[in-house]
């Protein structure tokens, strides 16, 4: 049995789904269940490093386009010594060596940079080629060369995926703002068709399970729903699916339209499971099993090693309009009039950052409200007294769980589903009616 997770997202801000997927990886690993987490697009080195930092392991990652090659592994195994021999490099070519990279320069001033993998000592993850200071090519390595990217003016024009003998098995070609995909003997004009052929490469069995963490506007959704393979298909709900006014969330329109194609649905809380059962009944889709499985877990409780900063409040989330961090800023600004010692730190990044920064300036709150960006929250929670959330809804609330595990007082709206799951009125925090 193999559990496939679709997908590890590329090109978007980090979010709670990423953390939930990493938690799933750790749990399945502990249970001894084979799991694969699918990159349906090739990740940048930075994005790959991000997912590995969350707790994913190289051997559990599945790169869709590499399935068209005869590669056996994508785990870095090429050592610095191996590549120095292949490139015929000497110590005289080395001009800079750091913990994470080795840079070589030649007589014509062109350069090579070996980028080392932090999880596999002395192994190279990728190599950059620079011509007159401009990036022209990047090669990725496992046991041998996996993929090559070709650049012009900092933009990728072509990406090739290699067999073990370095011949090209699959190719992506930029055509203006679109891409063509060359998979001999075919030339495919859209990525949905690439995903259809990728699924055939998996040779799915009846005991296998595919988990979709997202489906709306995803080019793998239609091939998965139309698959002939006997494997099971389940949808994991990470957001509100039906608003309290009865309107469906557009993110799940596709899911409800084809609900009968799914074998299971999974929610993060019992509360959402109850609402989903009602929604499916209204859609005429009774009988589909629904399981409530938390999307996160705590390895251990986090205790403060000293006194928490007095009157300290934090929130942590993607800076997105739905999170309504603007409300948190306004609330803290009002409270600051009565509690001048109040300090509020906002962790996370996102498209709302500039708007929130302007709001802080408008309220003249720069001295006590701060945007902190990304940080290792496990080390930060114990320094604060209160966790504040003003999100319109949370299907689970990973940061709520983490804050509760670190002993913070929790404040939030009495809104579905995470807040009433974690906040126990008068015990570990307070719920505010959303209408107020």
Model-predicted segments: where are they?
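A short, active-site helix/loop in glycosyltransferases that binds the activated sugar's phosphate group
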Residues: 260-287
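A conserved mid-protein helix/loop that constitutes part of the nucleotide-sugar donor-binding site
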Residues: 311, 318-337, 351-354
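Short alpha-helical donor nucleotide-sugar binding micro-motif in glycosyltransferases
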Residues: 374-375, 379-384
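Conserved acidic donor-binding segment of nucleotide-sugar-dependent glycosyltransferases
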Residues: 424-426, 430-436
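Short glycine/serine-rich donor-binding loops of glycosyltransferases
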Residues: 397-400, 419
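Aromatic "clamp/platform" in nucleotide-sugar-dependent glycosyltransferases that forms part
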Residues: 392
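Nucleotide-activated donor-binding/catalytic signature segment of Leloir-type glycosyltransferases, i.e.
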Residues: 355-374
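Short hydrophobic beta-strand element within catalytic cores of glycosyltransferases
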Residues: 409-413
């Amino acid at each position: 049995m193999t559990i496939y997770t679709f997908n590890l997202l590329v090109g978007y801000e980090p979010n709670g789904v990423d953390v939930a997927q990493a938690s799933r990886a750790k749990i399945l690993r502990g249970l001894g269940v084979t799991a694969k987490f699918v990159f349906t697009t090739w990740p940048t080195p930075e994005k790959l490093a991000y997912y590995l930092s969350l707790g994913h392991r190289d051997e559990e990652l599945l790169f869709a386009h590499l399935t068209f090659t005869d590669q056996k592994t994508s785990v870095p195994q090429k050592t610095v010594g191996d590549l120095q021999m292949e490139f015929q490099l000497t110590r005289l070519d080395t001009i800079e060596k750091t913990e994470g990279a080795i840079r070589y320069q030649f007589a014509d001033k062109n350069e090579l940079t070996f980028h080392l993998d932090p999880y596999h000592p002395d192994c190279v993850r990728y190599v950059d080629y620079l011509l007159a200071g401009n990036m022209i090519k990047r090669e990725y390595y496992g046991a041998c060369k996996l993929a090559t990217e070709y650049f012009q003016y900092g933009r990728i024009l072509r990406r090739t995926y290699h067999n073990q003998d370095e011949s090209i098995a699959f190719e992506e070609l930029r055509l203006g703002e679109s891409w063509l995909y060359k998979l001999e003997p075919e030339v495919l004009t859209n990525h949905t068709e690439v995903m259809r052929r990728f699924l055939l490469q998996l040779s799915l069995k009846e005991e296998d399970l595919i988990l979709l963490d997202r489906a709306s506007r995803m080019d793998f959704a239609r091939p998965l729903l139309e698959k002939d393979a006997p494997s099971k298909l389940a949808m994991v709900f990470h957001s509100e699916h039906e608003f309290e006014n009865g309107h469906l969330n557009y993110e799940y329109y596709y899911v409800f339209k084809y609900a009968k194609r799914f074998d299971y649905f999974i929610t993060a809380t019992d509360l959402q499971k109850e609402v989903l059962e009602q929604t499916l009944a209204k859609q005429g889709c009774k009988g589909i099993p629904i399981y409530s499985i938390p999307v996160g877990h705590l390895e251990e409780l986090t205790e403060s090693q000293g006194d928490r900063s007095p009157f300290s409040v934090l929130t942590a989330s993607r800076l997105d309009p739905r999170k309504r961090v603007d409300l948190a800023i306004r609330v803290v600004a009002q409270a600051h009039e009565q509690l001048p010692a109040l300090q509020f730190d906002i962790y996370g990044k996102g498209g709302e950052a500039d708007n929130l920064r302007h709001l802080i300036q408008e309220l003249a709150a720069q001295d006590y409200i701060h945007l902190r960006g990304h940080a290792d929250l496990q080390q930060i929670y114990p320094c604060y007294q209160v966790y504040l959330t003003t999100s319109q809804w949370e299907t689970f609330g990973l940061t709520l769980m983490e804050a509760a595990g670190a002993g913070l007082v929790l404040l939030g709206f009495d809104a579905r589903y995470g807040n009433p799951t974690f906040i126990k009125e008068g015990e570990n925090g307070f719920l505010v009616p959303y209408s107020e």
